[in-house]
């Protein structure tokens, strides 16, 4: 009986293996946090590099010697070694007459009833030459001499580690960047045309 009690006491006081058990308790949250930091760092890296690539391509394209397809290819080549498999890169280019008009509607020059919207009898500056009043008159493409070109890039990529769903996040990430550059004066900038509305379709 005494031997049995002593043996039981020795087992209860035995500390060997305690460190391993403690490590097992903290290992999962520690490695989850470590992977999260690495994933966040990768996202920041993609953001920084994609911004740098976009700025370089935009400067190169300002000479008017690059097509939209060549711009898209240059961006893809610049990010090819960086992004993961199954990632997609979307590049959007729109040209404007000047910086102040980026993303804005065409300017009304005559507002008959003063309501701030285009109505029959009103006139506006038809920046993109399509005879329609646009709330964002940007023209798809690389624009002409002295035009302002807005470049936007969207990188949709799988995360570095497929663990985001464990904490309710998406398994993919989206990184977006944009910049605007004035084209070089490689010719004469096209003048703006005033258009008057007779009827609304």
Predicted features, each with a name:
Residues 2-3, 55-201:
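Short, conserved structural patches
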Residues 1-79:
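Alpha-helical assembly-interface signal, strongest on the long, hydrophobic N-terminal helix that forms
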């Amino acid at each position: 009986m005494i031997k049995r009690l002593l043996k039981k006491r020795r087992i209860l006081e035995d500390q060997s293996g305690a460190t391993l058990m403690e490590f097992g308790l903290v290992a999962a949250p520690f490695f989850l946090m470590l992977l999260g930091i690495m994933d966040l760092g990768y996202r920041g890296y993609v953001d920084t590099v994609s911004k740098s690539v976009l700025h370089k391509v935009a400067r190169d394209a300002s000479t008017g010697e690059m097509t939209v397809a060549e711009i898209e290819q240059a961006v893809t080549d610049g990010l090819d070694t960086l992004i993961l498999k199954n990632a997609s890169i979307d590049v959007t280019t729109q040209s404007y007459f000047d910086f102040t008009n980026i993303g804005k509607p065409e300017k009304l020059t005559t507002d008959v009833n003063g309501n701030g919207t285009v109505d029959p009898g009103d006139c506006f500056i038809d920046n993109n030459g399509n005879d329609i009043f646009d709330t964002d008159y940007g023209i798809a493409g690389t624009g002409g001499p002295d035009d302002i070109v807005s470049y936007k890039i969207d990188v949709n990529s799988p995360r570095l580690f497929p663990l985001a769903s464990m904490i309710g996040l998406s398994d993919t990430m989206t990184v977006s960047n944009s910049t605007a550059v004035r084209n070089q004066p490689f010719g004469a900038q096209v003048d703006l045309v005033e258009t008057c509305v007779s009827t609304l379709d």
